[in-house]
Amino acid sequence: MIPTIYQYIYMIYGGIRAIMKLVSATVIILVLIAVVSTCGCTNASADGDSAESKIFISGAFALYPMMITWSEEYQKIHPEIQFEISGGGAGKGMTDALSGMVDIGMVSREIYPEEQSQGACWVAVTKDAVVGTINSNNPAAEKILSRGATKSDLEKIFVNNSVTNWGQLDGMEGVDVRINQYSRADACGAASIWAKYIGDYHQENIGGIAVSGDPGLAEAVRADTFGIGFNNINYAYDPTTELPIEGLLILPLDLNENGKIDSNESFYSTRAEIMEAIAKGIYPSPPSRDLNLVTKNEFTGPTKDFVEWILTEGQQYVTENGYIPLPEEVLTSELNTVMESGI
């Protein structure tokens, strides 16, 4: 029998219904698989076993090279952790940390009371120092290096601007070489600690041409025969040769103020020499200082784990990178602070 047109329509309709049922069942199965898979991913993330995390860090140029090394070494054992690290100065690090823009702020100065009241939680992780610098082609370089500079000299040069020529200083009679001061434009620990060493001053009291960043300040002095400035030691010394950066000389401090650099005040030839002087307390504090990591309220999660690692296993990389280890009792105290912080 030949099917009528109505029978054809009915058969087609039945086929479509069968297909729809099959498709619906397939869709339901796929949805269930997706839900189960999603649940599995959520649990893994919560457990912290396989989920990737990114730690955001900003702040002091002083800590930047060390932080790069720490992050690279940490990733070798924790490849699931990613880092985004930027400089900008200690002021930026503190602001970013307190505002929640970053997980960790690198701060190369003391933590101010007003920052503590805003929830700043911090630990010291290593130590370095700020040194004065002059251009290596300064015509009076030999006399400057043998005489050094007292706190009073630096105050007259950087703060009062009452000395604008090296010949105006005691023991430099007959010298006629002008002085061009350079300082930092960004809110930073280096300028703060340099000002504190000179006297009861702050960064805003330091005069001269303002330049952004540690590398920028070093380059400005290198480019000016009559330039004088200051830098964190890892921007004043070449990390490969451990000698002062080409174009720079380190300005010795006349610590006993007797008008000359004595043998026990001469420790600037290499980075290793000044590091030893800092470690022994011969080079004063300030301008040596602790370097801090800051977060808002408390260290938690992957950030907490990372900072704990820095204070323990991470300390093995400190000296080779031009930083001075903190005493064991200080590291233990700081580690306890982190371990008692957050979750």
Regions found by a protein language model. Name each.
Residues 1-49:
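Secretory targeting signatures
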Residues 41-98, 107-111, 116, 121-123, ...:
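Exported/periplasmic ABC-transporter solute-binding proteins
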Residues 101:
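Conserved functional loop/turn residues at catalytic and ligand-binding sites
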Residues 104:
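Short, structured active-site "lid" loops
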Residues 127-128:
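A catalytic-pocket lid/entrance helix-loop region that shapes and gates access to the active site
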